[in-house]
Amino acid sequence: MLEELNAKEKYSFNKLQKRLRRNVGQAIADFNMIEEGDKVMVCLSGGKDSFAMLDILMSLKASAPIHFDLVAVNLDQKQPGFPEHVLPEYLTTLGIDFKIVEEDTYAIVKEKVPEGKTTCALCSRLRRGILYRTAQELGCTKIALGHHRDDILETLFLNMFYGGKLKSMPPKLVSDDGKNVVIRPLAYCKEKDLVRYAEVKAFPIIPCNLCGSQENLQRQAIKQMMQEWDRRFPGRLETMFTAIQDVIPSHLLDHKLFDFKSINRDSGIIDGGDKAFDPPELPKAPLLDIDEMDMLDVIEVR
């Protein structure tokens, strides 16, 4: 599709491509996601996000100041209608190391989950276990997942509204089995950017609902809420994402994170003190993602 773009569309896509590369590079640097000598297992589901993650990581690898290896891994869960040929053919054309793991988790899920109920939770747990095992077999030091900024915010709201926790998706963590380090290189990337990137790149997308299951109602409601906010209040999601990167425990209520009991008159003013009755200090404009590429000359996309 790239060759079908006109000059204006190519300019726009060039900005998008640079923005996504910058976002991924910044996340990797901020959280020390990839280090010298790492072997990164890139989990490829066949969706837009994992395709984009692989594409961007391959691009960054070519110019990175450190050496690391990539291996793409797809789990064929034997869902009815899964096009087995698509990913091997695509990955072969890229010239990247890859492995297709075949495990009939679909049969297990259909046996365990009542008809009409969402299978996503059990399917996800089974998939994680297989991927963790595969990472060990391949000698991988990091496992890269394709969750993006919107996934992180959705999870934050799900935990707040339905779980009573201020908790989201970490950009980097130790896996459930304690043997793997999991990273999310797309943590700073907007979903709408990834959608457009996948469209232009014409990735061979495989639907994620071949099993017939759908997201649970709570996640659907959160997604719709965020889409409405983004439409009606431009910049709100950007501001909220900035907020979870600037947490002040002394101004929350979790005594496990801050020692409120020890505070006395000699403690001094902590983190600005109590400004509850002061006029709110709000920015004059939303914290929009201003792209410095707007100020540069047009660069031809080849």
UniProtKB/Swiss-Prot annotation:
Places the protein is found: Cytoplasm
GO CC field: cytoplasm
Keyword annotations from UniProtKB, A to Z: 4Fe-4S, ATP-binding, Cytoplasm, Iron, Iron-sulfur, Magnesium, Metal-binding, Nucleotide-binding, RNA-binding, Transferase, tRNA processing, tRNA-binding
Required cofactor names: Mg(2+); [4Fe-4S] cluster
Annotated coiled-coil segments of the chain: none
Any one Gene Ontology BP term: tRNA thio-modification
Positions contributing to [4Fe-4S] cluster binding: C120, C123, C211
Enzyme Commission number(s): 2.8.1.-
Cofactor remark from the record: Binds 1 [4Fe-4S] cluster per subunit. The cluster is chelated by three Cys residues, the fourth Fe has a free coordination site that may bind a sulfur atom transferred from the persulfide of IscS.
Motif PP-loop motif, residue numbers: 45-50
One annotated GO molecular function: sulfurtransferase activity
Enzyme class: transferase
Reactions accelerated catalytically: cytidine(32) in tRNA + S-sulfanyl-L-cysteinyl-[cysteine desulfurase] + AH2 + ATP = 2-thiocytidine(32) in tRNA + L-cysteinyl-[cysteine desulfurase] + A + AMP + diphosphate + H(+)
Gene3D superfamilies per the UniProt record, alphabetical: HUPs
One of the Pfam families matching this protein, by short name: ATP_bind_3
Family, as annotated: Belongs to the TtcA family.
Assembly: Homodimer.
Function (record text): Catalyzes the ATP-dependent 2-thiolation of cytidine in position 32 of tRNA, to form 2-thiocytidine (s(2)C32). The sulfur atoms are provided by the cysteine/cysteine desulfurase (IscS) system.
Miscellaneous comment in the UniProt entry for this protein: The thiolation reaction likely consists of two steps: a first activation step by ATP to form an adenylated intermediate of the target base of tRNA, and a second nucleophilic substitution step of the sulfur (S) atom supplied by the hydrosulfide attached to the Fe-S cluster.
Protein name per its UniProtKB record: tRNA-cytidine(32) 2-sulfurtransferase
Species whose genome carries this gene: Aeromonas hydrophila subsp. hydrophila (strain ATCC 7966 / DSM 30187 / BCRC 13018 / CCUG 14551 / JCM 1027 / KCTC 2358 / NCIMB 9240 / NCTC 8049)
Taxonomic lineage from the root: Bacteria, Pseudomonadati, Pseudomonadota, Gammaproteobacteria, Aeromonadales
Gene: ttcA
